[in-house]
UniProtKB/Swiss-Prot annotation:
Keywords: Cytoplasm, Methyltransferase, S-adenosyl-L-methionine, Transferase. It is an enzyme of class 2 (transferase). Its EC number is 2.1.1.144. It catalyses: trans-aconitate + S-adenosyl-L-methionine = (E)-3-(methoxycarbonyl)pent-2-enedioate + S-adenosyl-L-homocysteine. It is found in: Cytoplasm. Catalyzes the S-adenosylmethionine monomethyl esterification of trans-aconitate. InterPro entries: Methyltransf_25, SAM-dependent_MTases_sf, Trans-aconitate_MeTrfase, Trans_acon_MeTrfase_C. GO terms for cellular component: cytoplasm. This is Trans-aconitate 2-methyltransferase. Its main location: cytoplasm.
Length: 275
């Protein structure tokens, strides 16, 4: 049976938890640095950090371009409250990115680990490009987790952890969790190349080495698992966690040094407009 402390940690995931999210801040910062290294802008006037969360990327953007007008945008009041404590010059806006529009054209739209939550990239990305100034840049990285082992194990638990091996949650939840918002690399190119002067697209797998008794769960519960943990009632959540934690421990055993290997794939996109 899953431990009581895990039930408490997973109890209500309808809100973002800044403290839990920052548990792996160094590892979450790594793809941001990789993405920034591919952004070729000398002195952007106006930067929007989309899905800024606690400001991990916002702070790096402020360091690189201290003179830029910097805006952090996120849907979570809890995350924005944490980000506002950073010692940087930035404004903070609470908004749903599905409907958000920049007040003024952006030199850089920076989206770290957020666009994979939004559907219909074939219309989303052109809409974001339309909010750039001439020569502006859209830079994004997205976890490509639909084929990851921990995600497939989550789907397995959702489909079979109910009484007698029945599914948990609503059919709508199970359908949504099976959807794939992130496109293939070649489809991103076909979408963006006709609209841009330059497009740089790549995929990276980082072998993340994580600490703790349940590090894979601690990582995914604050992001990918939020819809599941937010919908399931207490009994269904208990059944789900019993099954899912057991599967994770079997598939991701601790190494001899007590740490856990957590391979993680991400797609990177840098799309620049003509001047």
């Amino acid at each position: 049976m899953v431990r009581d402390d895990l039930r408490c940690r997973a109890g209500n995931e309808t809100h973002w938890d800044p403290t839990a999210y920052m548990q792996f801040a160094r590892l979450r910062q790594r793809p941001v640095v990789e993405l920034l290294d591919h952004v070729d802008l000398y002195s952007p006037e106006r930067i929007y950090d989309l899905g800024c969360g606690t400001g991990i990327a916002t702070e790096l953007l402020a360091r690189r371009w201290p003179q830029a007008e910097l805006h952090g945008v996120d849907s979570s009041a809890e995350m924005l409250e944490e980000a506002a404590r950073l010692p940087i010059r930035a404004s903070w806006e609470r908004a749903n990115l599905q409907h958000w529009c920049a007040e003024r054209p952006a030199s850089l739209l920076f989206a770290a680990a957020v666009l994979h939550f939004i559907e219909r990239h074939c219309s989303l990305l052109p809409r974001l490009l339309g909010q750039l100034s001439p020569g502006g840049c859209l830079a994004a990285h997205m976890p490509n987790w639909r084929d990851a082992s921990w995600y497939r194990l989550m789907l397995d638990a959702l489909d079979s952890a109910g009484p007698g091996g029945t599914p948990l949650g609503s059919p709508t939840l199970r359908y949504l969790m099976q959807q794939r918002n992130v496109l293939s690399l070649d489809n991103y190119y076909r979408l963006l190349a006709p609209l841009c002067a330059e497009v740089d697209i790549w995929e990276t797998e980082h072998l993340q080495v994580v600490d703790g008794n349940d590090p894979i769960f601690d990582w995914v519960k604050v992001s990918a698992l939020r819809p599941v943990l937010g919908e399931l009632d207490e009994e269904a959540r208990r059944r789900f966690l019993d099954r899912y934690l057991d599967l994770l421990h079997r598939y991701y055993p601790q190494e001899l040094d007590g740490r856990t290997l957590f391979p993680f794939r991400r797609v990177f996109v840098v799309a620049s407009l003509r001047r």
